[in-house]
């Protein structure tokens, strides 16, 4: 038996079958860093139309989690897809560096500022700590394959950025939006500071629920306000509260002017008494009390009760009944205990009625001496003392526990209180900021589109923004206030600029260490220097001004902001408000949001559940490209499900892409595009078709990338690999690739097609599978640039014109016939009739149209169907042994070839064994030997 293997063109490539990504990716990263790839991309794209994706800064504390990975990968996919689409798309990563979590960490290390260490030392340690956290996070982001200016990120603690944050505050003040007020704000007793809406998250909490009696000072006068009064027993107004700690600050009871109120006779264990409740609430309240024996003995309307004076349940304090539109009948009794210190509605209705605040709770949540018997107690631990006071005065009607959603600090995860304090606010109404922001939302493109409704909903409920914090590590509110008038210094714009210039040199210490006399001279004694710091949401919210405006490679407004869906209430909103306040226009043209990551069971990831999936671990085992492919393959507009099992499936789909690329490159063995490329007009028809398919797909992918439909990109690429290439084209060309002469048109045409496709393919996957794409790029034949990321969409894909006899519709019909025939072949194989399709002779019984189509391929139809012999006959000649297929107008008969197999091409042909020189070969293979005439192909 002769060895004909040397006469075959066997595939060969240095591109390994196994990705081994966890080991191979770090070397690729080092190569990118050594060649300064990001700067090379900037140089290549300079002068193109820009696309600015502005990075929402993660907080500089702790290791990155899978949510961080999702966010950064989505951004990277967009930046890279814009670059390959012909844009100049710089990416400047950023970090949010000030605020409470870092203060807490530093306190654990060196103690509290002002006690254990000086404030200046404390700030220096905070800065140092933030830098260490940034470096750790940066390493992981880079390891994910995210390309950006990692050597020059923006940090909100950079001196220049801190100075520009102060300047932004000055602009907002100059435009009339900054006001000082005394209002209840969310207050963290752990942090000792105010919080803005964006820093609040709701968690379930069990609270003590109390119904409390407020007795009237003049019972007869109160009863006179009711009609047809009956019954007996003492009278009291009943309030319901889930915050017993606010009762010492109770100063009024609010009722709704238009609600009907009932006098209810009932025995709650102290004998008969008469309770005043909203009439609509009587049934539900009595049910809650577990009481069935009660009756309504009088009625009135809320407005009639205004002015009634009640006694505080356990303090010597007059409690007026006041009217408030905020009162509802959704829960409680319809009578609302009102503490202006501890609620926005309470504060507002109190102010309308001339009731101020009494400030019984200190910064740390402990009652002051003015709270009498509660002095020194913490608001979290006062329930028992309040209960004792109520019981002592027979004021407790009913006690229970309630499980409800309660505001918590998003950083410390501890419950918050409302507390009235003097604070700085960005007013939503003084200069029409809120209305302007609502109007601006309409001009922004929201992805998904429901983001617009969500943002509008957030704005509709948006109070004045409390931007002041009582912290040490933060950008200062660098203002001077007149001690008498409480007005800003008349030269505030000039003073802001003076301070900003100093901060550029010394950082925020410049303000905190500065004496007022240095700027104000003799006027210093008339002014007080504000010691508050800015909300960190202000820091990040003004980066459109403090960063985008300051970096030459960026431009305002940004084309895109992209963050998690929680940022409608966070960064998207703070950025919008500050941009409108400074410039009157939104800071972004488009806003894209992604969902949160959950485990395979749809549960939020948490250490307590043990379901946290570490991106670092995945990178060290499967590789970053697997995480990147998972992100692209997942619909980011909803919750993003991830688990080890899901990532294994992603790894399987990755292998399909890798193996497809490897097959194409292996079959480019010996191909030099400079000398071996076949012009389109001379290419085999099937090869022209696959290039046309790639050209059409490239357009579709470009559209999908531009619309941020990355799961569509993935689906289309996977489909191209499994259907167009793996399921058809690559199978068909194997014979031509392996068996025709090395330099034949038949082989070089297929190699030309493969070269065009893989050139395009490497660019298609580059935004998603960045490591793999550049690995492919380094393996491709021919002269090329240093990296795939320096390229744009491949321009060598030539579409079919539509005039060809073998155009798109022709190949569509051929492919349909092949799929239908393959099912019959597969059935024959599974029944044991044959082992391989090449051992089959096939007869196709076709209707006239299909017969005409398939006959155009002539003898080459057998190569398309990968069979040894194919006949095409009229459908009318089909016998009972012909199998009907899914394709109308086609029946198929398959039988085992009676001829001997050619040892070189494995086709079964009549002439095998009849040629003395090469008895084991078919005539075609004899012709394709190096000294033969060579086979001619036209179609397949």
UniProtKB/Swiss-Prot annotation:
<dbReference type="GO" id="GO:0002161">
    <property type="term" value="F:aminoacyl-tRNA deacylase activity"/>
</dbReference>
<keyword id="KW-0547">Nucleotide-binding</keyword>
<keyword id="KW-0067">ATP-binding</keyword>
<dbReference type="InterPro" id="IPR002300">
    <property type="entry name" value="aa-tRNA-synth_Ia"/>
</dbReference>
<feature type="short sequence motif" description="'KMSKS' region">
    <location>
        <begin position="604"/>
        <end position="608"/>
    </location>
</feature>
<dbReference type="InterPro" id="IPR002301">
    <property type="entry name" value="Ile-tRNA-ligase"/>
</dbReference>
<keyword id="KW-0963">Cytoplasm</keyword>
<dbReference type="Pfam" id="PF00133">
    <property type="entry name" value="tRNA-synt_1"/>
</dbReference>
<keyword id="KW-0479">Metal-binding</keyword>
<feature type="binding site">
    <location>
        <position position="902"/>
    </location>
    <ligand>
        <name>Zn(2+)</name>
    </ligand>
</feature>
<comment type="subunit">
    <text>Monomer.</text>
</comment>
<feature type="binding site">
    <location>
        <position position="925"/>
    </location>
    <ligand>
        <name>Zn(2+)</name>
    </ligand>
</feature>
<feature type="short sequence motif" description="'HIGH' region">
    <location>
        <begin position="58"/>
        <end position="68"/>
    </location>
</feature>
<keyword id="KW-0030">Aminoacyl-tRNA synthetase</keyword>
<feature type="binding site">
    <location>
        <position position="607"/>
    </location>
    <ligand>
        <name>ATP</name>
    </ligand>
</feature>
<dbReference type="InterPro" id="IPR023585">
    <property type="entry name" value="Ile-tRNA-ligase_type1"/>
</dbReference>
<comment type="similarity">
    <text>Belongs to the class-I aminoacyl-tRNA synthetase family. IleS type 1 subfamily.</text>
</comment>
<feature type="binding site">
    <location>
        <position position="905"/>
    </location>
    <ligand>
        <name>Zn(2+)</name>
    </ligand>
</feature>
<dbReference type="GO" id="GO:0008270">
    <property type="term" value="F:zinc ion binding"/>
</dbReference>
<dbReference type="InterPro" id="IPR001412">
    <property type="entry name" value="aa-tRNA-synth_I_CS"/>
</dbReference>
<dbReference type="GO" id="GO:0004822">
    <property type="term" value="F:isoleucine-tRNA ligase activity"/>
</dbReference>
<feature type="binding site">
    <location>
        <position position="922"/>
    </location>
    <ligand>
        <name>Zn(2+)</name>
    </ligand>
</feature>
<dbReference type="GO" id="GO:0005829">
    <property type="term" value="C:cytosol"/>
</dbReference>
<dbReference type="InterPro" id="IPR014729">
    <property type="entry name" value="Rossmann-like_a/b/a_fold"/>
</dbReference>
<dbReference type="Pfam" id="PF06827">
    <property type="entry name" value="zf-FPG_IleRS"/>
</dbReference>
<dbReference type="GO" id="GO:0000049">
    <property type="term" value="F:tRNA binding"/>
</dbReference>
<dbReference type="InterPro" id="IPR010663">
    <property type="entry name" value="Znf_FPG/IleRS"/>
</dbReference>
<dbReference type="InterPro" id="IPR009080">
    <property type="entry name" value="tRNAsynth_Ia_anticodon-bd"/>
</dbReference>
<feature type="binding site">
    <location>
        <position position="563"/>
    </location>
    <ligand>
        <name>L-isoleucyl-5'-AMP</name>
    </ligand>
</feature>
<comment type="function">
    <text>Catalyzes the attachment of isoleucine to tRNA(Ile). As IleRS can inadvertently accommodate and process structurally similar amino acids such as valine, to avoid such errors it has two additional distinct tRNA(Ile)-dependent editing activities. One activity is designated as 'pretransfer' editing and involves the hydrolysis of activated Val-AMP. The other activity is designated 'posttransfer' editing and involves deacylation of mischarged Val-tRNA(Ile).</text>
</comment>
<dbReference type="GO" id="GO:0005524">
    <property type="term" value="F:ATP binding"/>
</dbReference>
<dbReference type="InterPro" id="IPR013155">
    <property type="entry name" value="M/V/L/I-tRNA-synth_anticd-bd"/>
</dbReference>
<dbReference type="InterPro" id="IPR050081">
    <property type="entry name" value="Ile-tRNA_ligase"/>
</dbReference>
<dbReference type="Pfam" id="PF08264">
    <property type="entry name" value="Anticodon_1"/>
</dbReference>
<keyword id="KW-0436">Ligase</keyword>
<dbReference type="GO" id="GO:0006428">
    <property type="term" value="P:isoleucyl-tRNA aminoacylation"/>
</dbReference>
<dbReference type="InterPro" id="IPR033708">
    <property type="entry name" value="Anticodon_Ile_BEm"/>
</dbReference>
<dbReference type="InterPro" id="IPR009008">
    <property type="entry name" value="Val/Leu/Ile-tRNA-synth_edit"/>
</dbReference>
<keyword id="KW-0862">Zinc</keyword>
<keyword id="KW-0648">Protein biosynthesis</keyword>
<protein>
    <recommendedName>
        <fullName>Isoleucine--tRNA ligase</fullName>
        <ecNumber>6.1.1.5</ecNumber>
    </recommendedName>
</protein>
